C-alpha cells in the first residue's frame, strides 16, 4: 500500500466527478477541460473514467460536443462507490504491508487500523459527490492528487 489511503487515480476520479457535478445538467465536459481545470494528467483520465462508466456513474459521448457527464445525480453517487470502482479492495490492505490483513494477531496495529478504517468507510459511504460540491463552494477546497488532506484556497468569488 502507498503512504496514502486512496490512490492517486482515485483522487483524480473524485476531483473529476466533482467537476462534472458542478456543470449544468446535460452539459458534456471534454477531457481537456476536466484535465486543465482539475490539474489531472491527461494520461490518467481515460484510465479512471473507464471503470466509472462501467459502473454507470458516468456517461460518455463521442464526437463534436461530446465528452463526459454524470449518469446519475451527484447526490446519488457515494464516495465509496468511486473508491471501490477505482481502488477495489485497497482499503482492506494492512497499513504496514502490501496485502490484506489475514490474521489480526500478526499485526499489532490491526485493532487500531480496523477502527480507523471503519470510520473512514463510514465517511465514504455517507458522503456524496454533491456533498463535496457544497464543501468546495463554501470553502473553495481543492482535492490534491495522492489523497493528501484537502487544501483550503481562499475564494476569489
Show where each model-derived region lies.
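Short, Lys/Arg-enriched N-terminal segment that forms or immediately precedes the first helix
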Residues: 1-6
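Conserved segment of winged-helix/HTH DNA-binding domains
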Residues: 8, 73-98, 113-118
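N-terminal helix-turn-helix DNA-binding core of bacterial DNA-binding proteins
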Residues: 8, 12-40
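Helix-turn-helix DNA-binding motif, specifically the short coil turn and the N-cap/start of the second
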Residues: 41, 71
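Residues in the helix-turn-helix
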Residues: 44
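Basic amphipathic alpha-helical segments that dock to polyanions
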Residues: 48-53
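Beta-hairpin "wing" of winged helix-turn-helix
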Residues: 57-70
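C-terminal regulatory/oligomerization modules of transcriptional regulators
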Residues: 98-157
